[in-house]
Every structure is written in structure tokens, then in C-alpha cells.
Amino acid sequence: MTTILTDLSSSLSCHAASKDSPTLPESSATDLGYYSAHAGTHSPHDYFQSQPYSQPISHYPYHQFNLNGLGGPGTYSPKSEYPYGGGGYRQYGHYREPAMAVQEPVTVKEEPEPEVRMVNGKPKKIRKPRTIYSSYQLAALQRRFQKAQYLALPERAELAAQLGLTQTQVKIWFQNRRSKFKKLYKNGEVPGMEHSPDNSDSMACNSPASPTVWDNNTPSRAHDPQAQPLPHNSSPSYLEDYNPWYHHPQNLSGPHLQPPGTMHHTPPGTGAVY
């Protein structure tokens, strides 16, 4: 019994002590007053020393922009927090424009000039302009044509280099000249031209020799009874162009190419060989 009484008395004393304790129920109030009193006694040095630990989260961006002169920390506008949005777009556009400017000429060059045009609803190919030859080039081409109507590839390249023309231009000129020459011969305007040894026509081998063609410039031609007058439809202009055909092959060998003066002086003993 004595122990029970002592326990009860001790518990009652503890409850009384806890109830009468001035610190437990007023701990929050006393703590606030204590810390507020101490906060008033802090020095400015302690206040600024503890300030960086609580303020960098909210004031660090404002201090950064204050250095650039964009305004105070309190007047900073929310729209200027995104300066890289529009600037990035303009920067992309700035680098995009030169690329587009470079691509534009390429697209223009890729478009070829139209070589076909519509005439009466039908496509017609545009012909290239004709080549205009100078008088020097025409004279040189004419002299070469009188020597040979067909040119080998090295000869054509050499002639084109001498005259300042392309091989295609020389080739086309010779083709046109040959067709014109054949047309004149068929019309009878240039007689005896097919007998030239330079011509590659097979008809020249079957035609008889005509000695009056080779010595038309000699004075004995007027007294030659075998000389035949030229046809009336012959054109003097064409004869002047082809005049070298008549006398330049005299240096070639062959009995049918010799002038008539040399043919009459053959020795009489040559018939004994047969």
C-alpha cells in the first residue's frame, strides 16, 4: 500500500509540475519573442551576411540584367524574359536568305532556252543563225576546194585552225559547195568539170579526154580546128571561179592528160613494140 501511495503522489506531483510549468504552454510565444528580440539586436553586417543565402533564387536574374541597363529588379517585364525567341527566328531568317539567293541563279541557269516554238499550232524548231564568212576565208576555202573536194580529218582540222573556223563549219561549207557544184554541172552551166582527176565521181573515168580543156589559156586555142565553143547557157562568173580547174593538172602524168603539142611528137618506132 505504501508503494501505491507513493506512486500516486509522485504522478500527481508530476502532473502538477507540468501544469504549473511556465515554459511548456507558452513555448511558442516566448520563442517568437525571443527570436524577434534577438533579430532587432542583429547588426547590419550579420543581416547582409545571411541575406545571400535566402535571396539568390529570386533576385539573381534581376541583378544580371541590371548590369546591362535593362531596368530595375522591380520593373522587369515578363515579356523581356524571352529575348531569344524572336532573335533566334530573325537569326535563322538572316542565314536563310543568302542560301535562297544563291539557289535562285541556279534554277535560272537550269532552264534552257526554248528551241521549239509554235507556228500555226505546230512545233517548229528554231534554226541557228547562219555563219558569215569573211572574204579571206571564202577565198581560202575556194582555193582548197579547187584542189580537192573532199578533205581528210587532219586536213580539215589544219584548214579550220588556219582560218579561225571550227571543223564543223569547214565541213558544212564543203558539203554545200559540192552540192552546188553538182547542181551546176547537171544544168550544164559548168561543162567538163567532171573530168577533173580530183573529183571522186565514177563518171569521170568513162568520159573521153578533152585536150582543149587543159590549154584554154594558150594562144593556139583560137586556131585549133578541134576547139569547140562553149554552150550559150554557160555563165562567165562560174567559169572564172573554176578557171584553175583547166590548167593546174598539167603537171600530172598520163597520156590522156598531155597537151596536144606533146602528143604529135611521139616517135614512130613505138608501134613496133606491139
Swiss-Prot record:
GO terms for biological process: epithelial cell differentiation. Residues 199-220 have a biased composition (Polar residues). Keywords: Developmental protein, DNA-binding, Homeobox, Nucleus. The keyword Nucleus applies. Residues 259-274 have a biased composition (Low complexity). InterPro entries: Distal-less_Homeobox_TF (IPR050460), Distal-less_N (IPR022135), HD (IPR001356), HD_metazoa (IPR020479), Homeobox_CS (IPR017970), Homeodomain-like_sf (IPR009057), HTH_motif (IPR000047). GO terms for molecular function: DNA-binding transcription factor activity, RNA polymerase II-specific; RNA polymerase II cis-regulatory region sequence-specific DNA binding. Its main location: nucleus. Pfam families: DLL_N, Homeodomain. Residues 189-274 are annotated as: Disordered. Residues 126-185 bind DNA. The keyword DNA-binding applies. This is Distal-less-like protein DLX-3. It comes from Pleurodeles waltl. The gene is DLX3.
